[in-house]
Amino acid sequence: MRALEANLLKFLKKSSQFIIPIYQRNYSWTDKQCTQLWDDIMRTGTDGRIHAHFIGSIVYVERALSTVSSQESLLVIDGQQRLTTCTLLIAALAEFFEQHKIPELLNSFSAKKLHNYYLTNPEEEGERHFKLILSETDKDTLLAILKNTPQPERFSSRIQENYEQFQKLIQENQDKLEQICRGLDKLVIVEVALDRTQDNPQLIFESMNSTGLELSQADLIRNYILMGLEPDLQAELYRDYWRKMEQLFGQEAYSQYFDDFMRHYLTAKTGNIPNIRQVYSEFKLFAHTHFSNNVKELVADIYTYAGYYCAFALNKETNPALKETFTDLRELKVDVAYPFLLDAYHTYKQEGLSTDEMCQIVRLVESYVFRRAVCNIPTNSLNKTFASLARNLDKTNYVESLQAELLILPSYRRFPSDEEFLCEIKIRDSYNFARRIYLLRKLENYGRKEKVNVNEYTIEHIMPQNPNLSDEWQADLGSDWQKVQQTYLHTLGNLTLTAYNSEYSDRPYVYKRDQVKDGDGNAIGLSSSPLNLNKNLPKEYWNEEQINLRAERLSVLAAKIWSIPYLTQERLSHYQPQKNTETTYNITDHPHLMLNAAMHTLFQTLRQQILAFDECVSEEFLKLYVAYKAETNFVDIIPQAKRLRLVLNMRFADIQDPRGLCRDITNLGKWGNGDVEVRLDNFDDLTYVMGLIRQSFDYQMIKD
């Protein structure tokens, strides 16, 4: 490897050609990065005290260790973003010089020299004519700019937009052309030439990913897969799989969602959820473990699952029935279910499920998630529930085993029953519910063949929100009208949809229902509404009784829409785990708690406070310690003669312990689970120690 400081323009002039390998990410600099480069150039070109401005490194591979004086094409390993952006700026400047017939500036800036020195190789033809050849997605767009020809049908919007931005900036600063040219002439890079036979481009590439626009996890994965392959295989895999995958996503969606897809893919394949910042590291381990000898099979598998993801997550599904179910699920924003859906969709595509069965599965997930949201069950556990869900299913009876698996989930993972769901949906604040539009849309469109676009309507409170209700409203609601309004205002029974919210305002109920008219005298009251939500409203008054009656009717409908599956106890027992026949323990198996009254009292107080954290916390007495679990163990208590020894299941570096009571037991032999130990022997420290335990509980509940 050889690294040299170089003037950018001189570097471009003496270089024959740069090629962006197919494994590199697409051009991705935005207006923000382009504006920053422009500002740096203008500042540098204006200030005579600034002799150079460093813009980063250009790392390339050549066949032998030499300078760029050789005429071979150079593969760019790092620096394509700044190299491409500078090329766009120079192209825009050359075009302006040519159109406005600008004479040569600073003895080296003219339309001809800008083209022949920095953009093209005048004596070459075909692609060799151009200094910079981008990867497949961007290549034709840049070449169209350099050749001044129309853009292809599928062009790179990022390249075109940034080129137009530079055109605009040059136009706005045409009285400062010398400063622009002088600033360009002061740009400096570090050119890093790698020897293909001695240097590892992948390791160097990873180590240098610290400047410019940060590479995504997906960019790193693509480079990892393709960079080390022979050129022919590299081109084949890119052409047959990766390029098709990019096109399947679309340019913007690929940039926005491919990282998420890879995380869901790894979760589906391994059952473990990678930290969002560790997807690349986890992928390398996965690839080495499962596809170490067959990179083509790996890329083909990613491509296959990417097709599944695009179908349900990016609205690419072609089957009408499935498309509708996926649309509803996306509106719920339950990305955590995607690893499970990847598995289900794979089974579907392998003809292990019919379309109807696949729809049932999606509707079941939708009901499970929505019922939990209505019942305000914490969502912390959903990602782990769906990460491992498919592994527990009988693939020969997928739907029924999924129904059973969801029905037997305990406690905070539970599928809310009809009783719980019906109670909560009637009394909860539905107006300030994040999924209120989804709720009303589904209720309105149940049974409709021609769906209503509820986005054309606004939410109407039948009983108004105004705390200063009119005499008519007070009479309808009765002597406790304030309590009735406070209790039922935002509940489902009092909410509907209308296009005439301003016309209804706070007017009396009978007026809202029957008397309001538009400018042409047409009735536009609730009784004239075409919406199902506005049918069967009472004629004379609106009060607590009527709100409850409507809430009851709508809640029964909701239970049909978001239904819970039914299995006989016999079928359910078939899927329930076998009861543990191992030895069980209880408090009597811990003599230090039974024989020492002080330790017994301290332990009982401590356990009660731990169990009060959340209903999801469970307690298990083991032979040597007592475990407290949420997602996993978060604290284990080891009773001793004079103290309780607590092991917290979190990293020692993450614990906040200003009093310094904790001890680092990482890599030490121990009972319990975790790297943090704290000892408790008196009630004075109980509150402080509970704060430490709470940290471990929160850590288990929120960690990815």
Question: Which residues fall in each region the model found?
Answer:
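A cross-family structural signal marking well-folded subdomains
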Residues: 218-221, 226-437, 525, 534, ...
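Short, conserved beta-strand/beta-arch hydrophobic-aromatic motifs that form part
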Residues: 620-676
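A short, surface-exposed helix-loop junction/capping segment
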Residues: 16-20, 580-595
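Secondary-structure capping and boundary motifs in well-ordered enzyme cores
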Residues: 69, 75-82, 181-184, 193-200, ...
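Amphipathic alpha-helical segments
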Residues: 596-616
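Glycine- and hydrophobic-rich flexible loops that cap the catalytic core of alpha/beta enzyme folds
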Residues: 2-276, 509, 516-572
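Well-ordered alpha/beta subsegment
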Residues: 668-704
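Betabetaalpha-Me/HNH-type nuclease active-site subdomain
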Residues: 43-72, 390-534
